[in-house]
A protein has these predicted regions:
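Membrane-interface loop-to-helix entry segments
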Residues: 102-103, 113-119, 128-160, 321-339
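Transmembrane-helix boundary/entry motifs in multi-pass membrane transporters
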Residues: 2, 32-38, 61-90, 108-114, ...
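Transmembrane alpha-helical segments of multi-pass small-molecule transport proteins
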Residues: 6-12, 41-46, 82-92, 108-132, ...
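Extracellular loop-to-transmembrane helix junctions
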Residues: 2, 29-56, 218-232, 324-333
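Hydrophobic alpha-helical segments and their helix-loop junctions in multi-pass secondary transporters
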Residues: 18, 88, 92, 125, ...
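Hydrophobic, membrane-embedded alpha-helices of multi-pass small-molecule transporters
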Residues: 2-21, 40, 87-91, 95, ...
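Membrane-water interface regions at transmembrane-helix termini and the short interhelical loops
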Residues: 58-61, 98-109, 122-143, 209-212, ...
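Membrane-interface interhelical connector segments
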Residues: 174-179, 238-261
Length: 351
């Protein structure tokens, strides 16, 4: 059970980046649908748990060491090559966004120059990535219960002090916020498929190191359920205070500061922790795609890619990645379909 909880915690830790923890993603994909957002959250939870279990079990069975091992097995050479290319570019791109985001967060919190904040995050990420995969799982998993505790405090406070009823708040949410689709269930599935693309690479590496399929699969289920719990907690926190947070850039931080500056500080560190988690997960997955962690060239590659990531964070590389986000949603659907089909077939290692 301990191993399954670690996998589940790391699964959550990879997906819960700054956009999730700040509340922006939850507003866009769930809360803007009012009460139907609850149904969307429940639908996404079921799919996160099921697909997470499928990835974990197949990866454990094939003993994968990078996403390449699994993608070509489940998708064939042509589609596999395209998905491998998009995923690899996406992993590096999200890493760069996290480095740039850390710089902006450090500037806002401590008044440090943006470049210095980025370098601090890159250095911390590189040191972590040079550890073995089991240590990385443990580090990423640690932040999950901390975030869960902070979000629970905010949710209890928001509901206890709400000015309007949930029905009135839902009306405000539906009227004033733009939605990415008119259908709550399509948006929920889009959110799931995109995030499976985000976590897929590290999840295959993590679970490839687990020999027991049942333990790995249980980790995927636990992670999916924890994600659902976080989505619902943040959704209710935001919906309860919709009349207060409309137009706010970081709504969860605004609610935390409303409780007490100390809670606001805890939330700020939580956001930094989520940026760090995502940066480590993406950067490690990208590097192991091309270099084996056991070889000396791996550490050299980590340092080189870290330097490249820093330069990319300064020269507007993030505009390219924003376009990749849209592509990743569609690639995510193909990926999810391939994973489920492979799981149903009971795919085995090709010797």
């Amino acid at each position: 059970l301990k191993k399954s909880l670690q996998i589940g915690g790391a699964y959550v830790g990879i997906i819960v980046g700054a956009g999730f923890a700040s509340g922006q993603e939850i507003i866009q994909y769930f809360t803007s649908y009012g009460n139907k957002g609850i149904l969307g959250a429940l639908l996404a939870t079921l799919w996160f748990a099921f697909v997470g279990m499928c990835i974990a079990q197949i990866s454990s069975r094939l003993q994968t060491t990078s996403h390449k091992d699994l993608i070509y097995q489940i998708s064939g050479n042509t589609i596999g090559f395209l998905m491998d290319f998009v995923l690899s570019l996406f992993l590096f791109g999200v890493s760069v966004i996290m480095f740039a985001g850390a710089g902006a967060t450090f500037e806002q919190m401590f008044g440090l120059p943006v470049w210095l904040g980025s370098i601090c995050m890159i250095a911390l990420t590189m040191m972590t990535v040079m550890m073995n995969v089991k240590s990385i799982i443990n580090i990423i998993a640690i932040a999950t219960p901390y975030l869960l505790a902070v979000v629970t405090i905010i949710a209890v406070y928001s509901i206890a002090t709400m000015d309007l009823s949930f029905a009135e708040q839902a009306t405000i949410a539906e009227q004033q916020l733009q939605t990415s689709s008119k259908s709550w269930w399509v948006t929920a599935l889009l959110y799931m498929s995109f995030n499976i693309g985000v976590c897929f690479s590290l999840l295959t590496v993590m679970c490839g190191a687990i020999r027991n399929e049942r333990i790995a699969g249980m980790g995927g289920i636990i992670g999916g359920l924890l994600l659902g719990a976080l989505i619902l907690l943040i959704h209710f926190s935001l919906l309860a205070k919709m009349n207060v947070i409309v137009g706010v850039d970081i709504p969860m931080l605004a609610l935390a500061n409303e409780i007490h500056p100390i809670v606001g500080l805890l939330m700020s560190f939580s956001l930094l922790g989520m940026i760090y988690n995502t940066a480590v997960g993406m950067f490690y997955s990208f590097t192991v795609r091309f270099f084996k962690p056991t070889k000396p060239s791996f550490k050299v590659a980590v340092i080189f890619m870290g330097g490249l990531g820093f330069l990319a964070s300064l020269v507007g590389f993030t505009t390219l990645v924003s376009k990749l986000y849209a592509v990743m949603g569609y690639v995510g659907f193909i990926l999810v379909g391939s994973i489920i089909f492979a799981w149903l077939r009971g795919i085995r290692r090709v010797v």
